[in-house]
């Protein structure tokens, strides 16, 4: 649930009392009782010095002379970009502010029980310079570390083989063995957007994402606009990327100084925080992170008296996001490429391609037997190929060892077959989360309500009232996912319950059915109004004194536009189901549902106008609605809807970065901005949007980060564990996958887009546990590493999946034929593939730019024979309420030399779809080449 940082003009505010609370909260929610700001420290008194080396051609490094930490790190190709927060150097010059070049340690001498922490950032003193000439800067860090530290630390900046090198030499200076249970290298880059306007942030700031892959790990630092060179941080020698520890902002309440291992830079919606590259982490795994399954097993190293070890990182740049992997290869780093990614349904073959200068010695699965592995040999002499199959549900990892001893780890998530996972989710929604109490004073029944998986109970009260109030992303999430599930994978009992929810709750309570605010959508059905309830009605264990505990007036407000797409999506889903099946939808005709979706969309513009200037979460549903209005011949309504959307798109066209929201920076509006700027032909703005998405939606060998659009504050608004934290596969994953895959269908030679988009489209399935509970998101911090117990705002994530899931066939010159979302067979130059995504109603053949979709019916498999210019569709047998298939054929691109395929002339057309009678067994249909 995002909230806008800037004050809203009074005339446009949602509701007076709420707007005041809203503005106050965003400015101070993360800082209530915040300590004073630290004044600048003396670390800059001696000025700065540049590292000068002719062989360092890609980066310009400037160091603070007294600390030899980074003052600025800029790519030579675009020197106006600083990867580090050099613009804040003065304000971050006091003790406890971290800078690139610092070091964190957790140590324990032999015979001692407790670990002790040390940091070069906590109390700064000028380091003892050992070398400060041209291309090499070395310093003894003893002056900036406590006197009782049992090791000496020497830091060196240098250039090695054209790469910038940062190394730390650690020597045990005592007569006892020293256990190093925590060794963290702080990664401080310019992701601090505090106080910046949106355009300024896009011009100056960067995001960074980790591949926590042991010796093969790396960090990529990407400019917010997605353009320009990408900074890559990789291990030097044996400096494995074992864990990723957040640097929090806990401070001394009196002085404002950061506590040990903390940085006082305020974390919030405009600053996610910095992180430590953890080389060793056993000291944390035994204490702060005890009992948590990490990305990799925690380790320590024991340094004997007089013994020394060296750890380090190297820095170089890739010319662009899409060239990250080729740049890693050029710098002799291991590269992994997974198809369809790193989320493996148990009925789907996965493929892993490895590329490195050294041969693979072994590939093993942890836990043993979690993934079966078949060695397929080499592709194009470059990639070592493997076929994978998930055997056990849950988290797993592959550990690859190369002939030189390099170890690479890849995190996988094994899930049930997609169709089963989604069916389990639906069953859980309409049984465990089904709330049916006719005496509920808030008119929330019958319906699907939020759920707490930790207690095993429905969330009928929460002081963030929207969670229990069926509105906002965190309250509508469950019923929204349960609704859109039905148009792709309907269940008769669930559809009946959904219709009862629409008639009994949505229309007339959550949404006004008459009066001045007809079609307006309330902010919450649940509210905190103790004078209107029996004594002790509200749970006394909850804090009802926050702004989040809206009274009935605030909860009834209809001015938040972001609540409207949820309702539109529910109506539209029932329209699609009623239109394309027989007897499943019984309460209203399809025309009623389509009109409800249309009127609700217009009401968003008239009753909640302010935030419609921004892209809406799930806004893609408006584009689908427009297409359906046209298909049904409702030209007047279609013209009106298009006019309203053009007004919004014209505004976005005029803005440099049209991604405003309720927050100063967000990753949710881009989905709809891309849709409409593409639809109206504003390609330059669509490209700006796409590049911005690629900046925060990485392709990384990890089920958690691959295609996981950056989100880090919504646990505050929708989670049970409320904290600022990088959320993995929150709803940004599913929603941002929509433009990524749409763009891929327009440019089917760009495999990077498919990999990024498909990682995002499969992400929402990982949130579904074995019994069907769907969590808001995964907690990435190493003290938790688990899905949140609340369903929260999962719904928009599943909307992204439902509107976007498909099976993709493509061909790569090096990797050969690839299938995302199905199993592929190749024989005599022809290929066939099964469709194994849950809906099985969309197929894309990339070599042809051919997009095949079914409004009714399901694909079971597709045969494609390039030599004989043939496509054969295998359609699943008749199902409950579905006796005909309704096929749409679209060429979204024209790849060089591609044939165009069309339907036989004899096929009947209805509302733009080809109608094919289904048989009791499989139906086969052939497309014709021309």
Language-model features and meaning:
Residues 155-157, 168-172, 306-319, 402, ...:
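Short, hydrophobic/aromatic-enriched beta-strand segments in well-ordered soluble domains
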Residues 32-267, 272, 291, 301, ...:
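Beta-strand-rich N-terminal accessory domains
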Residues 15-28:
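Bacterial N-terminal signal peptides
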Residues 358-424:
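Extended acidic/polar, glycine-enriched regions
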Residues 423-734, 739:
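Catalytic cores of extracellular degradative/oxidative enzymes
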């Amino acid at each position: 649930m995002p909230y806008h940082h800037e004050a809203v003009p009074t005339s446009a505010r949602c509701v007076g009392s709420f707007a005041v609370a809203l503005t106050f909260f965003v400015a101070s929610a993360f800082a209530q009782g915040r300590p004073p700001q630290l004044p600048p420290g003396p670390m800059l008194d001696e000025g700065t010095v540049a590292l000068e080396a002719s062989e360092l051609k890609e980066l310009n490094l400037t160091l603070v002379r007294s600390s030899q930490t980074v003052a600025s790190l800029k790519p030579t190709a675009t020197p106006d970009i600083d990867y580090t927060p050099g613009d804040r150097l003065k304000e971050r010059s006091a003790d406890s502010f971290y800078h690139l070049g610092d070091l964190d340690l957790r140590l324990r001498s032999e015979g001692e029980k407790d670990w002790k922490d040390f940091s070069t950032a906590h109390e700064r003193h000028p380091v003892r310079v050992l070398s400060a000439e041209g291309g090499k800067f070395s310093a003894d860090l003893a002056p900036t570390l406590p006197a009782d530290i049992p090791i000496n630390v020497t830091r060196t900046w240098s250039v090695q083989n054209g790469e910038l090198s940062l190394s730390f030499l650690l020597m045990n200076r005592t007569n006892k063995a020293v256990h190093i249970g925590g060794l963290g290298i702080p990664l401080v880059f310019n992701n601090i957007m505090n106080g910046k306007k949106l355009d300024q942030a896009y011009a100056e700031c960067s995001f960074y994402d980790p591949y926590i892959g042991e010796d093969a790990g790396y960090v990529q630092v990407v400019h917010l606009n997605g353009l320009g060179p990408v900074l890559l941080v990789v291990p030097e020698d044996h400096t494995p990327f074992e864990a990723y520890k957040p640097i929090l902002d806990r401070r001394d309440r009196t002085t404002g100084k950061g506590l040990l291992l903390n940085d006082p830079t305020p974390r919030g919606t405009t600053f996610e925080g910095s992180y430590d590259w953890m080389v060793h982490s056993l000291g944390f795994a035994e204490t702060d992170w005890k009992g948590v399954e990490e990305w990799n097993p925690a380790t320590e190293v024991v340094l004997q008296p007089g013994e020394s070890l060296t750890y380090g990182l190297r820095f170089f740049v890739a010319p662009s996001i899409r060239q990250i992997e080729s740049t890693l290869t050029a710098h002799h780093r291991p590269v992994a490429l997974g198809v369809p990614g790193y989320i493996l349904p148990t009925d789907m073959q996965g493929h892993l391609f490895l590329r490195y200068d050294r041969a693979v010695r072994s590939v093993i699965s942890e836990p043993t037997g979690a993934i079966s592995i078949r060695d397929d040999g080499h592709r194009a002499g470059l990639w070592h190929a493997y076929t994978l199959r998930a055997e056990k549900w849950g988290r797993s990892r592959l550990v690859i060892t190369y002939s030189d001893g390099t170890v690479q780890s890849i995190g996988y998530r094994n899930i049930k077959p997609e169709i089963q996972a989604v069916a389990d989710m639906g069953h859980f929604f309409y049984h465990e989360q089904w709330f049916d109490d006719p005496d509920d004073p808030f008119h929330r029944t019958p319906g699907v309500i939020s759920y707490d998986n930790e207690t095993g109970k429905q969330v009928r009260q929460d002081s963030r009232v929207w969670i229990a109030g069926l509105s906002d992303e965190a309250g509508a999430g469950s019923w929204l996912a349960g609704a859109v599930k039905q148009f792709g994978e309907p269940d008769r009992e669930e559809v009946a319950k959904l219709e009862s929810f629409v008639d009994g709750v949505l229309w007339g309570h959550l949404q006004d059915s008459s009066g001045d605010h007809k079609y307006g959508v309330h902010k919450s059905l649940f509210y905190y109004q103790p004078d209107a309830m029996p004594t002790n009605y509200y749970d006394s264990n909850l804090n009802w004194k926050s702004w989040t505990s809206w009274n009935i007036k605030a909860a009834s407000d209809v001015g938040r536009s972001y609540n409207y797409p949820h309702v539109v999506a529910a109506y539209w889903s029932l329209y699609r189901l009623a239109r394309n099946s027989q007897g499943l939808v019984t309460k209203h005709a399809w025309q009623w549902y389509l009109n409800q979706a249309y009127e609700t969309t217009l009401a968003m513009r008239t009753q909640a106008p302010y935030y419609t200037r921004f892209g809406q979460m799930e806004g893609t549903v408006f584009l689908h609605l427009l297409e359906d209005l046209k298909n049904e011949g409702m030209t007047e309504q279609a013209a009106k809807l298009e006019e309203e959307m053009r007004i919004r798109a014209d505004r976005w066209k005029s803005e440099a970065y049209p991604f405003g929201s309720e927050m100063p920076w967000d990753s949710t509006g881009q989905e709809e901005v891309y849709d409409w700027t593409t639809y109206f032909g504003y390609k330059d703005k669509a490209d700006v949007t796409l590049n911005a998405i690629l900046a925060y939606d990485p392709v990384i060998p990890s089920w958690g980060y691959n295609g996981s659009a950056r989100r880090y504050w919504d646990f505050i608004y929708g989670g049970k564990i409320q904290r600022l934290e990088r959320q993995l596969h929150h709803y940004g994953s599913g929603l941002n996958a929509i433009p990524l895959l749409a763009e891929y269908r327009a440019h089917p030679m760009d495999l990077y887009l498919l990999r990024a988009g498909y990682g995002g489209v499969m992400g929402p399935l990982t949130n579904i546990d074995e019994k069907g509970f769907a969590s808001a998101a995964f907690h990435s911090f190493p003290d938790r590493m688990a899905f949140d117990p609340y369903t929260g705002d999962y719904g928009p994530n599943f909307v992204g999946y439902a509107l976007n899931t498909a099976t993709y066939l493509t061909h790569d010159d090096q990797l050969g034929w690839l299938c995302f979302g199905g199993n592929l067979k190749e024989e005599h130059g022809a290929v066939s593939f099964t469709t194994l995504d849950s809906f099985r109603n969309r197929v894309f053949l990339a070599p042809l730019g051919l997009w095949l979709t079914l409004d009714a019916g399901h694909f079971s498999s597709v045969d494609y024979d390039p030599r004989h210019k043939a496509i054969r569709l295998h359609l699943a047998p008749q199902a409950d309420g579905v006796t005909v298939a309704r096929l749409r054929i679209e060429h979204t691109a024209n790849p060089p030399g591609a044939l165009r395929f069309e339907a036989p002339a004899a096929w009947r057309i209805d509302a733009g779809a080809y109608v094919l009678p289904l048989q009791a067994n499989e139906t086969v249909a052939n497309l014709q080449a021309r």
